[in-house]
């Protein structure tokens, strides 16, 4: 393996970094979920400023191996960062956060990341569709955009039962505070409602009927989606049918009990065993020969152990970088919007080198 390093020209943009944060509070939401709020020291306040829709990555070491998980921020902009966590059976992180973490504990937390960002200055009409723990980014988006006096929000929130609704009291408080500007609709799949339309899963047919009855889609400025793969796919399909432009639909995927989706396109046919891959990060350039059978993120780990990542599943967007030179194959993408892809951005955890030389810039 050959490695070359050099310093690049302009100063790089600020990169997400880990810092030890003290847990301020752990609030029980349901039997299997909590909200964890962090204290941020004065010197890190600016670094941990977040936009509605962004996420925090939590890091811990178990048995000498580093693990990371990304969790959506569920606080209004300007408040202390807070994440919502629902336990996954035998989950390495979720069980720890739900049952073991206490106020006063110190946790390694990365500064906010993510391209799912709502701008409260825009006002407008917003449609939010969430299922289960997909409500977490919606808590930040809804509470933030409604600070604009002209903003309106319709939130369709799917759960199994009323007892499994995360942030039930806070959602009721938001409804009381904003009245007719917030239309809150609970849809339950395992608990009968008085209205049949509100009983069942948020699948395509029910979404069509809900939107026809409640939401003039042609007046929607932005749609925000968060939940499991099936709900996201159905929501995007229905909104497309109803004429909402794709660049107005923003989504975040949660993988819970979902089979891996099919590749979005066939794998590229490559020749040769390796590519010379150049990594630009924090103003430092590193070039190394890497196998074409490994993702750029995994292949570069041997020479650059400072690369940003979290889920490694093409979902969180933490490993986003711009493909500046060469050809590469991004096999899955559930984090970048089409505009970002058109600008050359890729998820390095899902991108494999194809050409003899490839350059990706994390500072772009």
Predicted region positions:
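Iron-sulfur (Fe-S) cluster-binding modules
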Residues: 1-15, 20-22, 32, 241, ...
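Active-site proximal loops enriched in glycine and acidic residues that flank catalytic Cys/His/Asp
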Residues: 227, 253, 279-281, 290-292, ...
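Iron-sulfur (Fe-S) cluster-binding segments and ferredoxin-like electron-carrier domains
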Residues: 286, 299-308, 317-364
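Ferredoxin-reductase
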Residues: 3-106, 110, 124, 159-162, ...
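FNR/FR-type flavoprotein reductase catalytic core
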Residues: 95-269, 273-278, 285
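Ligand-binding loop in jelly-roll beta-barrel domains
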Residues: 77-80, 120-124, 353-362
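C-terminal accessory/binding modules appended to enzymatic or scaffolding proteins
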Residues: 272-308, 312
